[in-house]
Amino acid sequence: MKEVGNHFAEQGEDVDFLWCSSDPDSLDGIVLKKRRIALLDGTAPHVVDPQNPGAVDEILNLGEYWVSDEIRAQRGSVISCNERTSAMFQMVYGYLAAAGKRAEFLAEVLQRMLGEESVFEARRALQTKIGSVLTVRRTEAKRNRDRAMGCLQAPGSCKRAFAGAITPDGIKNELPSLIHGLEKVILLHCPEGFPVQKILEPAMERLLDAGFDLEAYYCPMDPAKKLEHIVVPDAGFAIVTCNRYHTVKADSNTQKSLNITLEVPKNVDPVLQEIR
């Protein structure tokens, strides 16, 4: 998959590389966006069955090419390795569940420390910086004119994914590749653990309402709720959350960076200060 993806990327095509969280040097899939073609690893633990076999979906069965006799000779080692791997996965998921509870508690504490006013100011600052993007201003103005004339307005679409993962080699992310080629990057600096979706979700709703197709990237620790990054390719900008677990620098030669900082106040409740 790497060779296929790199082949088309070298020809200038827009290719999504879907990296594996269990093995960060391997791919689970690639997407050739303009061609509307995806190549996926359909084996466990992410089995994918064809939805329209033959008409749309094709199966590449690499099992036709393995040397069965040599693999069968290692049957005991293969089974033992899989059993150890399964046991390790169960242990890791236990640790992640505990870390998830800590993250929930930390989010509540940080909200109390920062207060609604700080969150409101950060939300307003973000909306202002989004409004400074020329493409957004022009698109919203046109949408408003069309609405005034009674024209139907279709919202934009949202692709949801992960920009990073918790891997055996530590926390990994591909943020630099996501902002590559964009004109502006809005960097939202906030304490790790803060529920940054409270700031980002209104921005995402605004952009979708304006008709922009966007990419929304979620936190692996809270994939159902915690929005962390937004990329708007057609408007040439992205919003990236920066903390000690993931940060990115805009290219000073080709990109303009806009910063918003949400800091924990120094004078807070003594109990909360201890937690900090």
Where are these predicted regions, by residue range?
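Extended intrinsically disordered terminal tails
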Residues: 19-20, 106, 110-123, 139-142, ...
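Conserved nucleotide-sensing/catalytic segment adjacent to the nucleotide-binding pocket
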Residues: 5-72, 76-77, 207-276
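Glycine-rich phosphate-binding P-loop
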Residues: 1-8, 169-207
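Context-gated lysine
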Residues: 2, 33-34, 101, 129, ...
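Long, low-complexity, Lys/Arg-enriched
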Residues: 83-85, 168, 179, 276
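Generic hydrophobic/packing signal
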Residues: 93-96, 110, 190-200, 204, ...
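Charged, amphipathic alpha-helical linker segments immediately N-terminal to NTP-binding catalytic cores
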Residues: 61-165, 261-263, 270
